[in-house]
């Protein structure tokens, strides 16, 4: 799906890591939400409150997921899941466009 229809968008941006990671929140009619964002090259650690599905639309990164010491290479067209109340690290090597779905 290349677009979302009949949604609300929160005007205020979510800005993290001195502006190197930004996103906008999209709210669907059923109350579910996603964020659409961009990550610039760099290393970042994120903490989750709820489980997340991270879909990488374009770009490249390595990800260290909870319970795994080894990084996994992720590129545009791929996705990964993170459990609730967890922490994960990303090393973004090319500007990355992403969708984060809260599960």
UniProtKB/Swiss-Prot annotation:
Coiled coil: none annotated. Pfam families: Ppnp. The keyword Glycosyltransferase applies. Keywords: Glycosyltransferase, Transferase. Its EC number is 2.4.2.1, 2.4.2.2. It catalyses: a purine D-ribonucleoside + phosphate = a purine nucleobase + alpha-D-ribose 1-phosphate; adenosine + phosphate = alpha-D-ribose 1-phosphate + adenine; cytidine + phosphate = cytosine + alpha-D-ribose 1-phosphate; guanosine + phosphate = alpha-D-ribose 1-phosphate + guanine. It is an enzyme of class 2 (transferase). One of its GO terms (cellular component) is cytosol. GO terms for molecular function: guanosine phosphorylase activity; purine-nucleoside phosphorylase activity; thymidine phosphorylase activity; uridine phosphorylase activity. Belongs to the nucleoside phosphorylase PpnP family. Catalyzes the phosphorolysis of diverse nucleosides, yielding D-ribose 1-phosphate and the respective free bases. Can use uridine, adenosine, guanosine, cytidine, thymidine, inosine and xanthosine as substrates. Also catalyzes the reverse reactions. HAMAP family: Nucleos_phosphorylase_PpnP. This is Pyrimidine/purine nucleoside phosphorylase. It comes from Geobacter sp. (strain M21). The gene is ppnP.
């Amino acid at each position: 799906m290349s677009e979302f229809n009949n949604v609300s968008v929160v005007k205020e941006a979510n800005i993290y890591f001195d502006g190197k990671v930004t996103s906008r929140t999209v709210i669907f009619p059923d109350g579910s939400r996603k964020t659409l964002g961009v990550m610039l090259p760099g290393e970042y650690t994120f903490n989750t409150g709820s489980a997340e599905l991270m879909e990488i639309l374009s770009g490249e990164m390595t990800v260290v997921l909870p319970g795994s010491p080894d990084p996994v290479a992720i590129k545009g067209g791929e996705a990964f899941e993170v459990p609730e109340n967890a922490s994960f690290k990303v090393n973004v090597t090319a500007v990355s466009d992403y969708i984060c779905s809260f599960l």
